Amino acid sequence: VKYQAQIIKVAVKLISTTVTLVIFAIAAYTLSIVWRVSNAEQSIFGRSDLIPLALEQKQFDQPPTQESYGKNTYSHIVRGQPLQVYEQLLNSFQHVYGSALAASEIGELGADLLFKANEYFEAIFWRNSGTLNFYFDTKKDLANNAVGRKIGAEIKTGSLSGAAAEQHMIDKVFMALDGGLAYKNCSEYRVSQLPSLNDYGCPFLLNIQEMRRSDKSVVLK
């Protein structure tokens, strides 16, 4: 009995250590994705909303455009062309590019699970969770994640590597955003027509958001 107890104790310790290492590895990898997306954001748009990487970032100090749906913008040269940048555009880039990065490294399933976990985290902890705008933003994020995963899978199976692969990935991300394959703003009408959160493989995510509603007259659907 004493020998069995020692075996159980060692097994429990081994499992505990393994779980701790796995959690640490996932957290470290997630941070690496956030860091690299932030670097790309700063380099391309002159601003990073994930991790501020510059002492002076571009500010949304210019009038709204049709694509920004009433939100302020700023002007920046993006890929050689002047562009009015708005917050939702940055968020869309984060999800498409971040999902593409993850899918190219850990596969589509890993990227899918990682970014779905992010949606649950935001639904639980973000202040505006439970609002209609947050709900549509979640649908937009999930749709953009799917677009990014396809891009990443293509890069993973392609012949390019290193800087060339990264540049091709960014090119594909902008093709998706500019071509309408991805969604630039959660206020677009077509976002409201996207599948339900359950259809995206996120059970109970809608329930969490509904629990966070401060205005019970708002229907999230």
List the predicted regions and their residue ranges:
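Intrinsically disordered, low-complexity, mixed-charge
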Residues: 3-221
